[in-house]
Amino acid sequence: MELPQMPELMGLSLLVGLLALVATAAVARGWLRAEEKPSQPVCQKENEPKKSGSKKQKQNQRVRKEKPQQHSFTHPLLAAALKSHSGNISCMDFSSNGKYLATCADDRTVRIWSTKDFLQREHRSMRANVELDHATLVRFSPDCRAFIVWLANGDTLRVFKMTKREDGGFTFTATPEDFPKKHKAPIINIGIADTGKFIMTASSDTTVLIWNLKGQVLSTINTNQMNNSHAVISPCSRFVGSCGFTPDVKVWEVCFGKKGEFQEVLRAFELKGHSASVHSFAFSNDSRRMASVSKDGTWKLWDTDVEYKKQQDPYLLRTGRFEEASTMPCRLALSPDTHVLALATGTNIHLFNTRRGEKEEYFECVHGECIADLTFDITGRFLASCGDRAVRLFHNTPGHRAVVEEMQSLLKRASSESTRQRLQQQLTQAQEALKSLGALKK
């Protein structure tokens, strides 16, 4: 066998070595270029400036990105949205003088808003801190110089005094001692009588407690309703009512002597007519009317201006259908003049004309969470709701329409010129309010 000649083998070896050297040089040159010009991150565009900052700042940026977005809601009748809380709002209360709105949230603050700013572009609030706890319920004192809250973790009442400053704001100071713990079940509502004589607290079992302002229990009411779903003090301060699993609303009178001393709590009357458990109820501003909503899918308006001591029962004035109440919990608010009934289920609000029993307005997906509280201001001009980190205020157009209907009816029967002038003035004011909101029916 012949072997290859030596010159040919040497030439082939030199060619292979030269090719390997060229390839190595090309790879090394590519690495050098990569080091001179680092590649852009995938999430960063070519022209985007490089982000700088410390590790702590980057962590804070990540936290802000994870913060839930504020729920967006718009409607022609939305008057304002109050946004200062960083946590979900659970309760609201208008002061008796109509100047302030108190809100509490799980961000450990209570905020006091000025009602005169509602229609302004900016809504300022004053903050009261709830130390080492947060409030779930809040109520103004009758003189508007204090408010009480229910503490979520402490399971008791705390009183805050409001001291007016020279600049028009307030300084908030919690009293040294909270009320003693008495309830054994979760609290559903609290209240202060407009007379300032007593405080009410109600829990989800069957207990309603009547306290004096010093934190002493005056009376314990057993509602015998299997469980309580709502309880409230009447605006006249004479009555305390409750509703729950049973198909009725029970009302008691809190009796005081001529010298202001507490005497007793007596059963006054009941609202009977529903066929299932009652979700909620409310008194009118003069305590002469009441409204209730039940799991039987109806709401009812009652005349409670009766001589209950002579065994006279309240009169049923109107029954309306509300099927949503038969499948889910429902909140209720009655306008001060009883012309409008607001019902809330989930995140939606329905407004009814109580004279005709018809639904007039519907607000859908008002909040990002289920509506926690619903109330009219003391003038009946606005309806307020909360359910996330904002309070939403609506113009009460059904209330203005009800005034128009009522004044037109009364004008036909007016006998004196002075009466006609007064009624015509109220009619004109209501029509102008509707016109300004674009809600005047032609």
Curated annotation (Swiss-Prot):
Q: Which Pfam families match?
A: WD40 (PF00400)
Residue positions where Phosphothreonine is found in the record: T428
List, as start-end ranges, the regions of compositional bias called Basic residues: 52-65
- Keywords carried by this UniProt record: Isopeptide bond, Phosphoprotein, Repeat, Ubl conjugation, WD repeat
Q: Which SMART domains match?
A: WD40 (SM00320)
Q: Identify the SUPFAM superfamilies for this entry.
A: WD40 repeat-like (SSF50978)
Q: Which domain of life is it from?
A: Eukaryota
Name this protein carries in UniProt: Transducin beta-like protein 2
A GO cellular-component term linked to this record: endoplasmic reticulum
Where does each WD repeat begin and end? 84-123, 130-170, 182-222, 224-263, 273-312, 323-362, 366-404
Q: Which GO terms describe its molecular function?
A: phosphoprotein binding; protein kinase binding; translation initiation factor binding
Q: Which PANTHER family match?
A: TRANSDUCIN BETA-LIKE PROTEIN 2
Q: Which GO terms describe its biological process?
A: cellular response to glucose starvation; cellular response to hypoxia; endoplasmic reticulum unfolded protein response
Q: Where is this cross-link: Glycyl lysine isopeptide (Lys-Gly) (interchain with G-Cter in SUMO2)?
A: K164
Return the annotated region ranges for Disordered: 36-71
* InterPro entries referenced in this protein's UniProt entry, alphabetically: G-protein_beta_WD-40_rep, WBSCR13, WD40/YVTN_repeat-like_dom_sf, WD40_repeat_CS, WD40_repeat_dom_sf, WD40_rpt
Q: Give the species this sequence originates from.
A: Mus musculus (Mouse)
